[in-house]
Amino acid sequence: MTEIKGISVDEWKKKICEEAERLRPQLIQLSHSIHDEPEIGFQEFKSSAKICDFLEKQGFETERGYCDLPTSFKAVKKGTGKGPVVAFLAEYDALRGVGHGCGHNVIATCASGAFASLAKIFVEMGIAGEVRIIGTPAEEGGAGKAIMLERGGFDGVDFALMIHPTCGGESRNYINRNGRASGSLTISFTGQSAHSSAPATGINALTAAISVFNQIDMLRPLFETEDNVNGVILEGGTASNVIPGFSKSEFCIRAATMKRIDELQNMIIGCAKRAESLTGAKVQIQSEPIYAERYPCLPICE
């Protein structure tokens, strides 16, 4: 297709870019505003409201609380009839204790600008199809998109687009990049607090957590090239003269495939159960839905 309604595709692209340029000041303000008030996963109430307010000011109706997630949203612009459905995905959660170190304020703003610009010109073009923007909370842990997928949040979407900031200028631009599968585990141990002068009267939950980390390190020679397991201890006591009665650790797991994530998770769960047996601390394990590996569609990328 080289023309639409007698106008070249390049000219339509120019119109879309001109609309984006018109929105530039508002988009920059939106990005800075989200950046200035970072919110962690599923708590992005201000951020999602700011994006919806921007979209509504551009004349779009928004569905807040999409997929029964309070900080998710959706807006839609339909064409002249049934056709391809493209969705721009917006992320806007921040890293705990860091803020927007991964630039989700930029992701949200780019998605908002791309949707608003394309949707407006899309109507002028008079073609069939649909343009959507979908607000996806809790990317930095919480598996927001996986939950939305299970609830039908992406039903009917033919292809989805998202941008992610990086460093290095144009030499680091990636259009058709693959992505590894990922998952996470939260492992908690409940023991028995005691005074450090009488450790035998307690059950050290921190020792159990440390045992899990040590066992994982022993298993690393068995890891495949793209396997990655990183963990942190979130809770492990509050005073050095008290045997910790509770510990909580979180593990981020990446691998080439969902199948391998499942295998790695089972290995770590085995470590946790052995630590429970060794120390006597009771273990509780929580997992999030696994993100599948990503395969880009080259024709769409082009």
Describe each PLM feature range.
Residues 22-25, 42, 46, 50, ...:
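Conserved active-site and cofactor/substrate-binding residues in soluble primary-metabolism enzymes
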Residues 65, 89, 134, 232, ...:
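Solvent-exposed beta-strand sheet faces enriched in polar/charged residues
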Residues 67-68, 165, 289:
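Residue-level "edge-of-site" marker
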Residues 39-40, 134-138, 289-293:
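Conserved short loop/turn motifs at secondary-structure junctions
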Residues 1-11, 210-302:
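Metal-dependent amide/peptide-bond hydrolase catalytic core
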Residues 71-77, 93-101, 105-106, 122-244:
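Histidine/acidic-residue-rich, glycine-tolerant segments that coordinate divalent metal ions
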Residues 2-132:
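Acidic/His- and Gly-rich active-site-bordering loop/insert found
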Residues 21, 25-28, 32, 36-39, ...:
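Generic secondary-structure signature for well-ordered alpha-helical cores
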